[in-house]
């Protein structure tokens, strides 16, 4: 991977949730690759949703300190800060593509970062939003970073561990 790749919250959640089976394995491998290549992009919205979901929606919710450690690790990624222009842009995308405001805010952040790929399970696999293509990393025939049309808790269960070169998702 050499370009930048935007990652939606659900992919990060699966990467940390050992109870998610095959989705955990795929998400973990993707996130580790993005860390290794330093090509991961997220937004403040994704970080906020991740923090809430780790504490409230995970199979075994984490406490605030464990959640803080995970979120802090992602601060090494490129982060799109959502502001007023982001909200206005998302409202335009919401109308144009008939998607939820929150999904439109993610798409707008991906566009703002100049990414061409948005990894998400929530949006339609293969859908183009201007220059940004959604790729569902859980669809059977996905090759990460492929720009062509895709064909197809407690701290023990939700955690990160450090390695010298990068973070490693458990």
Regions found by a protein language model. Give the residues of each.
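Acidic, metal-binding active-site segment of PIN/NYN-like and related structure-specific nucleases
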Residues: 104-146
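Acidic active-site catalytic centers that drive phospho-/nucleotidyl reactions
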Residues: 8-10, 49, 103, 122
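Short beta-strand segments at enzyme active-site cores
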Residues: 42-44, 119
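Short, well-structured N-terminal submotif of metal-dependent ribonuclease cores
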Residues: 1-42, 57-65, 141-170
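Active-site-proximal, substrate-binding regions of enzyme catalytic domains
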Residues: 45, 51-78
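Active-site neighborhoods of divalent-metal-dependent phosphate/nucleic-acid chemistry enzymes
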Residues: 76-121, 160-166
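Conserved beta-strand segments of alpha/beta enzyme cores
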Residues: 39, 78-80, 133
